[in-house]
C-alpha cells in the first residue's frame, strides 16, 4: 500500500482523479470487511490492512490529500503509524503480566469498539419469504444473519443486535424491536430468529385500516449494530464517601466505603461471613439466597429508589436478613440492608392552596433553523437565543454544539424554552446535552420530549415547551398577546450549505400550488412551491435574512411567555412552577384550588381503575356519508365541557360496591343494555356508546354488556333500553362541585370579550380561554403511566437486560415489582437506543370525575338535541351538529341558540344563523361545505384529518362521493421525530369513504 502511494507521489503532479480512484478502489470497505477486534490474534500484515479500521482511516487520509491538507509523504507516515497501532491491538498479550481480578461480577464495562451496518434486503442473496395473514415479505434468512456474527474473543462482551424496518406504499411504517443474535459471551441465541418473526407480526398488526390489505408491505432495511465492551475494574461509585451507608427513597445501602479494604470482603463480613479468597462469594456468606441488582440505566448516579434497580425474576419481598441483596456496578459492590415496605393509602384530591414558587431559575429562549438534506435529515444551520435580555446566535455545522457549550458555561440552573421544542428543537440539542450531563430524565409521549431534566456538575437544565400551554402557533399567539409580529421565511429555498451564502437580487415568498392528476379511480394530489419575488432590492445573504427572522421568533416567544405568566399571576394568583409543563397540569392546579372544602375526590385503586376505565368513551363522531345539496344548519355548544362541569352535578366521596342502580345517586356500573325494539327506531339519536373489538361505535344495537356512568344510563333509558346491573361503584354524594372553578374562568373570559382594556384584543380573555380549555378534566381521565421511555446507551443497556432471567410470563424484577422485559429500539443507530418499560402504576387522579364530565357532556348535547322533534343530524363531532334544516322548526331552533354557557350557537365564523347550501360528508373528520356569510360572500370550509388544508378543494370531496371505489392520494412531506434527531419523510395518504 505504501509503495503504491510512493509511486503515485513520484509519477504525477495533478493527482486528484487518481486519488479519488485510489480512495474508492483500494481503501474499500464491504460487508465482508472485518474489524480489528474480530480478527484472530497475531493475524498477518495483509489481514490487518484489510480491516475496517485501517481502510476507514485510509479514506480519511486520502480526503486530506485531495484537499491538500497533508502531503503524500505525511500520509505514508500516518498510515504506517495506524498499522503499528492496529498490530499492537492484534497481538496476544502476556497473560503473566495481567493483574488477576477477583470476580467479573464487580467490574465495569468500557466500550472498546462499536459499529453499525445498514443493509437493503437486496443485499441478502438467500432471503426467505415470511408470510403472516394476508402479508408476504422477504426477510434475511437465519443463516445469513448468523454469517454476520464477528469472531469472538474472550475477555470481551459482545452486544450484537438486528432490527428490521417494515414499510407500506402509503403512510404505514414500523421498526421491529432490537433482537440479540448472540448473547454477551458470543454464543448464538437459539431463539433469535423466532423472536424476529414475532416482532414482525407485531408491526404488521399495526397496519391501519387505510392501508389496503392487499397492499405491498416490504422489509425495507436491516440494521445491524455491534458494540464490543471490556471489563475494567474501578474503585468506587461516589466521590468523597465518608459514611458507611446511604439512605435512598425506599431502601438503605451499605456502601463498603473503606478504601483500604476490598469491597467484596467488606460485604462478606457485613453479611456475617468469613473472607477467604479461595472460596466463591456464595460459600463465604451464611445466606442461602443471593439476589443481585444492577442500575436500570447502567449508571449509579441515576439510582434514587428500588425502581431504578433491575434483577433476575424473583418473588417480590423485602427480606434483607435471609436474602443477600447485592448491588454491583462499576467495579464496586454494596449490600441492600433494608427495603421499606410499600404503605398503600387511599389517595384523595381535595382543595389545595396554590404554592407560589420562589426558586431562582434563569430562562433561555431559543429557536433553530434547518434545511433538509438529500437523505431527508434535518440539518441545523442556525440557532438564536435570548438570555438576560440579550440576543445571541451561532451558525454553521457546529452551531448546536457551540450553543450547548455556551449555555453550560453560565453555571446556573436554566429553563430552556423552545416553541414546539418538544417535537422539534429539543430533538436537535438533546444528543449534545445528554453527552455532557451526569444524569437526566425525561417525560416522552408520542416521541415528543414534553419535559426534561439534565443534571450537570454546576447546574440543572430543564426543558419546557410554551406550546404545551398555549396550544397554538407562535404566529397566532403573538397576535393574541399583542407582541412583536412574527415574520415569514422561505425555508424551502435552502437545500445545502452553499445556498446560505447566496444573495437573491429580490427577496422571495413561497406560495403552494396544488397539482392534480387522475389515474383510473384515483385522484393524485401534490403541491409545488412557487417562488414569488418582491419588488424591493435585496442585498443580504440568505443566512443574514434567516438570522433576522430567527431573532424575531425568539423575541416573540419570550414576550408571549412572559406576558402569559404575568397575566396568570395577576388575574388568577398562580405561578407556573418549574416542574409544571402542560396546560392540563396548570388547569388541574387551578381547579383543585377552587374545590369546596368539604369535597374529597376519591382516587381509585389500580384494581378499581381497571374496571371503571371501561366507562371512558372518547369524542363522539357521527357521520352519515353523502352529498347534501339542500339547506343544512350548524350549531355547537358554547363551552361544552365547562358547561357540563357547572350545570350538572358530579359525585365525590369513597364508593361502595353494589349490584343495583340508584338513579338518585351517581355511579359507574357494568350493565347489560337490551333495547325494547328489534330494529333501529325512527328518530333514534346515536348517543349510547359501546366498544366492539376495542373500536368505539355509536350505532344502534339490540343488546350489549359494558361499563357506563349514570348520565349515559339516563340517555340509554330515554332511547328505549332496559338496564340490567351486574356490579358497580356507587358514590355517596353529588353536588355542583366545579362551579367556583368555572365561574372564575368563564366570567373572566366574558368580562374581557368586549372590555375597555387598553390592549385589544384583550390578552386576559386569551389567558382565561386557555385555562378554561385546559379544564383539568383531561387529567382526571389520564391513564396511569403504563409506559416509561428512556434514552440509553446503544446496545449496552439492552445487552445487560437480556442477561436477566425471566419467569414464564417473560417478567423480570424492577425494584420491588415484576414487569415485562424492557423493549429496545434503535434511535440514531450511533449512540442511543430507546428503552420502553411497560408497567401498571396506581392512578393519581380521580378517574370517576373525568368519566362523569365526559358522560355529562354527552348528556348536555343529547338534551339540547331532544328539544327538536324529528331532528335529523347528518354529522356530529363531540360538541357540534350539522342538521337538515327541514327536520327542525327553524324559528324554534334559532330561538334556542345564543352565546350563554351551555347554549347551542349557530354562528359560523362571524355569521349568525348561517345556512349551508351544499355539504359533502366522506366519513369521520372528513367533510366540506359552502355557505353564504353575512356579507353575501360564498365561503368554503374543508376538513380532512391528517391532510393540510392548502391541499383540499370542494371538487375533491365531490369526486370522492361519486363512487365508493374512488380514492384520493395526497402526497406531502411530514416530520418524523426520532428523539435525538429529526427527519422529513414523503408521505402518501390514501383517502376513501369510510
Curated annotation (Swiss-Prot):
InterPro entries named in the record: DNA-dir_DNA_pol_B (IPR006172), DNA-dir_DNA_pol_B_CS (IPR017964), DNA-dir_DNA_pol_B_mt/vir (IPR004868), DNA/RNA_pol_sf (IPR043502), DNA_pol_palm_dom_sf (IPR023211), RNaseH-like_sf (IPR012337)
Cited Pfam families: DNA_pol_B_2
Keyword entries, A-Z: DNA replication, DNA-binding, DNA-directed DNA polymerase, Nucleotidyltransferase, Plasmid, Transferase
Enzyme Commission identifier(s): 2.7.7.7
Group of enzyme by EC: transferase
A molecular function GO annotation: DNA binding
One of the GO biological process terms: DNA replication
Gene3D superfamilies reported for this sequence: Palm domain of DNA polymerase
Catalysis performed (reactions): DNA(n) + a 2'-deoxyribonucleoside 5'-triphosphate = DNA(n+1) + diphosphate
Source superkingdom: Eukaryota
Stated family: Belongs to the DNA polymerase type-B family.
Further comment: This DNA polymerase requires a protein as a primer.
Name of protein: DNA polymerase
Organism name: Kluyveromyces lactis (strain ATCC 8585 / CBS 2359 / DSM 70799 / NBRC 1267 / NRRL Y-1140 / WM37)
Amino acid at each position: 500500500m505504501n509503495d503504491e502511494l510512493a509511486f503515485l507521489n513520484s509519477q504525477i503532479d495533478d493527482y486528484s482523479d487518481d486519488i479519488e480512484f485510489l480512495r474508492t478502489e483500494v481503501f474499500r470497505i464491504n460487508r465482508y470487511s472485518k474489524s480489528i477486534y474480530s480478527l484472530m490474534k497475531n493475524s498477518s500484515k495483509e489481514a490487518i490492512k484489510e480491516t475496517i479500521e485501517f481502510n476507514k482511516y485510509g479514506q480519511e487520509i486520502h480526503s486530506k490529500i485531495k484537499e491538500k491538507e497533508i502531503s503524500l509523504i505525511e500520509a505514508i507516515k500516518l498510515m504506517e503509524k495506524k498499522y503499528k497501532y492496529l498490530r499492537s491491538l492484534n497481538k496476544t498479550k502476556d497473560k503473566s503480566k495481567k493483574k488477576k481480578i477477583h470476580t467479573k461480577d464487580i467490574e465495569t464495562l468500557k466500550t472498546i469498539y462499536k459499529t453499525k451496518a445498514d443493509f437493503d434486503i437486496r443485499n441478502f442473496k438467500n432471503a426467505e419469504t415470511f408470510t403472516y395473514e394476508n402479508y408476504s415479505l422477504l426477510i434475511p434468512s437465519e443463516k445469513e444473519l448468523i454469517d454476520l456474527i464477528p469472531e469472538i474473543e474472550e475477555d470481551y462482551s459482545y452486544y450484537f443486535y438486528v432490527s428490521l424496518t417494515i414499510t407500506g406504499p402509503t403512510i404505514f411504517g414500523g421498526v421491529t424491536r432490537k433482537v440479540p443474535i448472540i448473547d454477551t459471551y458470543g454464543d448464538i441465541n437459539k431463539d433469535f430468529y423466532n423472536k424476529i418473526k414475532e416482532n414482525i407480526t407485531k408491526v404488521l398488526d399495526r397496519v391501519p385500516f387505510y392501508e389496503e390489505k392487499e397492499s405491498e408491505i416490504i422489509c425495507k432495511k436491516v440494521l445491524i449494530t455491534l458494540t464490543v465492551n471490556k471489563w475494567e475494574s474501578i474503585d468506587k461509585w461516589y466521590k468523597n464517601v465518608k459514611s458507611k451507608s446511604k439512605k435512598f427513597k425506599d431502601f438503605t445501602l451499605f456502601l463498603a466505603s473503606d478504601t483500604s479494604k476490598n469491597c467484596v470482603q467488606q460485604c462478606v463480613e457485613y453479611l456475617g461471613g468469613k473472607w477467604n479468597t479461595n472460596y466463591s462469594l456464595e460459600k463465604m456468606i451464611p445466606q442461602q439466597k443471593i439476589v443481585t441488582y444492577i442500575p436500570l440505566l447502567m449508571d449509579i448516579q441515576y439510582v434514587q429508589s428500588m425502581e431504578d434497580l433491575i434483577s433476575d425474576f424473583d418473588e417480590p419481598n423485602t427480606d434483607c436478613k435471609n436474602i443477600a441483596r447485592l448491588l454491583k456496578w462499576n467495579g464496586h459492590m454494596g449490600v441492600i440492608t433494608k427495603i421499606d415496605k410499600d404503605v398503600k393509602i387511599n389517595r384523595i384530591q381535595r382543595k389545595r392552596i396554590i404554592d407560589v414558587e420562589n426558586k431562582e431559575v434563569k430562562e433561555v429562549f431559543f429557536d433553530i433553523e434547518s434545511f433538509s438534506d438529500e437523505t431527508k435529515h434535518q440539518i441545523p444551520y442556525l440557532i438564536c437565543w435570548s438570555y438576560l435580555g440579550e440576543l445571541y446566535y451561532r451558525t454553521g455545522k457546529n452551531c448546536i454544539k457551540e450553543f450547548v457549550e455556551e449555555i453550560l458555561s453560565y453555571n446556573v440552573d436554566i429553563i430552556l424554552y423552545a416553541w414546539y421544542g418538544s417535537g422539534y428543537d429539543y430533538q436537535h440539542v438533546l444528543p449534545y446535552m445528554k453527552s455532557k450531563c451526569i444524569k437526566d430524565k425525561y417525560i416522552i409521549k408520542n416521541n415528543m420530549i414534553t419535559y426534561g431534566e439534565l443534571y450537570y456538575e454546576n447546574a440543572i437544565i430543564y426543558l419546557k415547551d410554551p406550546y404545551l400551554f398555549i396550544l397554538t402557533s407562535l404566529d397566532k399567539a403573538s397576535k393574541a398577546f399583542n407582541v412583536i409580529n412574527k415574520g415569514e421565511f422561505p425555508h424551502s429555498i435552502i437545500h445545502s450549505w452553499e445556498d446560505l451564502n447566496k444573495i437573491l437580487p429580490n427577496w422571495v415568498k413561497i406560495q403552494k400550488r396544488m397539482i392534480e392528476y387522475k389515474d383510473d379511480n384515483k385522484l393524485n394530489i401534490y403541491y409545488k412551491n412557487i417562488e414569488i419575488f418582491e419588488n424591493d432590492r435585496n442585498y443580504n445573504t440568505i443566512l443574514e435574512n434567516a438570522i433576522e427572522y430567527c431573532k424575531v421568533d425568539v423575541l416573540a416567544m419570550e414576550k408571549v411567555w412572559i406576558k402569559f405568566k404575568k397575566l396568570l399571576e395577576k388575574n388568577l394568583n398562580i405561578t407556573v412552577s418549574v416542574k409544571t409543563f402542560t396546560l392540563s397540569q396548570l388547569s388541574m392546579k387551578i381547579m383543585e384550588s377552587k374545590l369546596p372544602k368539604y369535597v374529597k375526590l376519591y382516587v381509585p385503586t389500580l384494581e378499581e381503575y381497571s374496571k371503571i376505565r371501561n366507562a371512558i368513551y372518547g369524542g363522539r363522531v357521527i357521520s352519515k356519508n353523502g352529498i347534501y345539496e339542500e339547506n343544512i344548519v350548524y350549531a355547537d355548544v358554547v363551552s361544552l365541557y365547562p358547561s357540563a362541569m357547572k350545570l350538572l352535578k358530579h359525585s365525590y366521596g369513597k364508593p361502595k360496591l353494589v349490584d343495583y342502580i340508584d338513579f338518585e345517586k351517581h355511579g359507574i356500573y357494568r350493565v347489560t343494555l337490551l333495547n325494547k325494539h328489534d330494529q333501529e327506531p325512527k328518530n333514534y339519536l346515536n348517543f349510547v356508546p359501546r366498544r366492539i373489538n376495542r373500536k368505539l361505535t355509536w350505532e344502534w344495537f339490540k343488546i350489549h354488556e359494558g361499563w357506563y356512568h349514570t348520565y349515559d344510563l339516563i340517555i340509554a333509558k330515554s332511547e328505549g333500553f332496559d338496564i340490567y346491573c351486574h356490579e358497580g361503584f356507587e358514590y355517596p354524594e353529588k353536588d355542583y362541585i366545579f362551579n367556583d372553578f368555572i365561574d372564575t374562568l368563564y366570567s373572566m373570559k366574558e368580562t374581557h370579550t368586549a372590555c375597555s382594556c387598553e390592549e385589544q384584543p384583550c390578552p386576559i380573555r386569551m389567558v382565561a380561554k386557555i385555562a378554561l380549555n385546559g379544564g383539568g378534566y383531561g387529567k382526571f381521565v389520564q391513564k396511569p403511566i403504563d409506559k416509561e421511555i428512556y434514552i440509553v446507551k446503544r446496545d449496552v443497556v439492552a445487552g445487560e437486560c437480556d442477561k436477566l432471567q425471566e419467569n414464564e410470563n417473560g417478567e423480570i424484577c424492577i425494584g420491588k415489582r415484576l414487569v415485562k422485559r424492557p423493549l429496545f429500539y434503535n434511535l440514531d443507530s450511533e449512540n442511543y437506543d430507546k428503552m420502553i418499560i411497560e408497567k401498571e402504576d396506581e392512578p393519581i387522579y380521580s378517574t370517576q370525575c373525568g368519566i362523569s364530565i365526559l358522560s355529562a357532556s354527552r348528556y348536555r348535547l343529547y338534551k339540547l338535541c331532544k328539544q327538536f322533534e324529528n331532528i335529523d343530524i347528518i354529522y356530529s363531532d363531540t360538541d357540534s351538529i350539522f342538521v337538515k334544516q327541514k327536520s327542525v322548526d327553524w324559528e324554534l331552533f334559532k330561538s334556542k341558540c345564543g352565546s350563554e354557557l351551555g347554549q347551542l350557537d349557530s354562528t359560523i365564523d362571524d355569521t349568525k344563523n348561517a345556512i349551508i347550501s351544499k355539504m359533502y360528508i366522506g366519513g369521520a373528520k372528513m367533510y366540506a361545505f359552502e355557505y353564504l356569510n353575512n356579507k353575501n360572500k360564498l365561503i368554503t370550509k374543508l376538513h380532512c384529518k391528517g391532510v393540510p388544508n392548502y391541499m383540499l378543494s370542494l371538487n375533491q370531496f365531490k369526486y370522492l362521493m361519486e363512487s365508493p371505489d374512488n380514492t384520493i392520494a395526497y402526497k406531502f412531506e411530514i416530520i418524523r421525530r426520532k428523539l435525538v434527531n429529526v427527519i422529513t419523510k414523503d408521505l402518501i395518504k390514501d383517502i376513501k369513504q369510510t
